[in-house]
């Protein structure tokens, strides 16, 4: 490492405390400590949030600032060392006692002007050392940049898989509680069916959890392969220029290109299979009401995104050419229990639920904190179900009618897959305490 030659106190400040090499793309934290950007992020890749400074252990939430001034200082110092090396007597040409200011790319050696004109090096590609250093560093940094972009994407996949695992554990625990509550309201009691349902839920939960962990391990393995090659490139980029020039980097560059072309596993999408609850739809039909919708609005774009869904699913996009319809019930409900069904088989994206007082901003519907929705969106090549309670839900997408059960006294809403007589999900009791009205929005296919 070039840091071995740092004796001057001022030059010691150019050494990264993580890799012990000269800074590459230096950044500094709020606490004042400085590191190579890659070193800092690679150091944090397996550490749970919040991230912390490797020197003082102060949390920094992965916020840092690029130190442009220090980067310039590093460049100046490295060039200064190269010139000191070239000007030293011990590194002059032994034959001609002249400075070696020319680089032979074929032989990978430094030459003086007279040696470069000799018969031995005729036909070889020569250039000044400054140009050779610049070209070598540009090629190194190009490979590093390519791998770094893939590393960041891969790290995002790792973090996403870990979040998915945590949410899966949490959602399965909550779902078990909801299932017990639903069975508790069935008449007559279905204790045996409830126990079988919960046993099936736990089995699927554990099986999926194992698959999620295997998926994470696969992603981590691929990321580590990229990291290994990246560290080699970074180590080479920190070598003194005079050493860097004479290195044969063809094999390293070849492995870098192969690593950059590796397929990146993106993690799995868990799905909870629908499980029928005997008598569920029959019981809910005792609260059946006919809902009349009004104020149906047709437009090519809607900002309907309850709970800022774009922040949770940034890859979810809207097509401005699509036709949206937003409708809400003529009547609001503040007491009692009500159940209605919405036929969704002809829609690829839809939202059902209840809202307080629908209002428009321009030609768009704007959701409020009291709105309780179940929303189906297309994300990449699959569908997701989302709600205000935690974002995405890993539940099998209903293909026909969705039932909506509103309990005003309990202050919650439940959604049912009518065809399979299964619970999609349910908001917790006490979620709202106001009059609400049915809501429906869809995108035409």
From Swiss-Prot:
One of its GO terms (molecular function) is zinc ion binding. Keywords: Metal-binding, Zinc, Zinc-finger. Residues 271-445 form the B30.2/SPRY domain. CDD domains: RING-HC_MmTRIM43-like. Pfam families: SPRY (PF00622), zf-C3HC4 (PF00097). A zinc finger (B box-type) spans 88-129. A zinc finger (RING-type) spans 16-57. Gene3D superfamilies: 2.60.120.920, Classic Zinc Finger (3.30.160.60), Zinc/RING finger domain, C3HC4 (zinc finger) (3.30.40.10). Belongs to the TRIM/RBCC family. This is Tripartite motif-containing protein 43B. It comes from Mus musculus (Mouse).
């Amino acid at each position: 490492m070039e840091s071995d030659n740092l004796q001057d106190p001022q030059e010691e400040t150019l050494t990264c405390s993580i890799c012990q090499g000269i800074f590459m793309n230096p950044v500094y934290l709020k606490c004042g400590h400085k590191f190579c950007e890659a070193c800092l992020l690679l150091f944090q890749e397996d550490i749970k949030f919040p991230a912390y400074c490797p020197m003082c252990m102060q949390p920094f939430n992965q916020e840092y600032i690029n130190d442009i001034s220090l980067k310039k200082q590093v460049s100046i110092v490295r060039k200064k060392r190269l010139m000191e090396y070239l000007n030293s007597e011990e590194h002059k040409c032994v034959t001609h006692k002249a400075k070696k200011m020319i680089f032979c790319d074929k032989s990978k050696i430094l030459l003086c002007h007279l040696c470069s004109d000799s018969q031995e090096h005729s036909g070889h590609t020569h250039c000044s050392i400054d140009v050779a250093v610049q070209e070598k560093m540009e090629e190194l940094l190009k490979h590093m940049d390519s791998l770094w972009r893939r590393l960041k994407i891969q790290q995002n996949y790792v973090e996403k898989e870990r979040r998915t695992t945590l949410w899966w554990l949490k959602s399965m625990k909550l779902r078990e509680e909801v299932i017990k509550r639903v069975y508790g309201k069935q008449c007559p009691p279905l204790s045996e069916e409830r126990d079988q349902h919960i046993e099936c839920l736990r089995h699927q939960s554990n099986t999926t959890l194992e698959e999620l962990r295997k998926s994470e391990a696969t992603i981590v393995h691929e990321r580590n392969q990229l990291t290994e090659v990246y560290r080699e490139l970074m180590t080479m980029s920190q070598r003194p220029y005079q050493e860097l020039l004479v290195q044969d980097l063809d094999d390293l560059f070849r492995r870098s290109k192969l690593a950059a072309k590796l397929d990146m596993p993106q993690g799995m999408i868990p799905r909870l299979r629908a499980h029928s609850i005997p008598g569920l739809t029959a019981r809910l039909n005792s609260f059946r009401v006919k809902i009349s919708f009004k104020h149906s609005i047709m437009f090519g774009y809607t900002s309907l995104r309850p709970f800022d869904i774009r922040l949770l699913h940034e890859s979810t996009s809207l097509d401005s050419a699509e036709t949206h319809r937003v409708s809400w019930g003529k009547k609001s409900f503040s007491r009692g229990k009500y159940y209605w069904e919405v036929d969704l088989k002809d829609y690829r994206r839809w939202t059902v639920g209840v809202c307080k007082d629908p209002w428009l901003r321009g030609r768009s519907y704007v959701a409020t904190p009291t709105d309780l929705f179940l929303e189906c969106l297309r994300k990449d090549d699959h569908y997701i179900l989302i709600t205000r309670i935690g974002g995405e839900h890993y539940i099998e997408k209903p293909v026909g009618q969705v039932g909506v059960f509103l309990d005003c006294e309990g202050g919650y809403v439940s959604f049912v897959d009518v065809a399979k007589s299964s619970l999609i999900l349910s908001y917790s009791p006490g979620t709202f305490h106001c009059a609400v009205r049915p809501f429906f929005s869809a995108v035409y296919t």
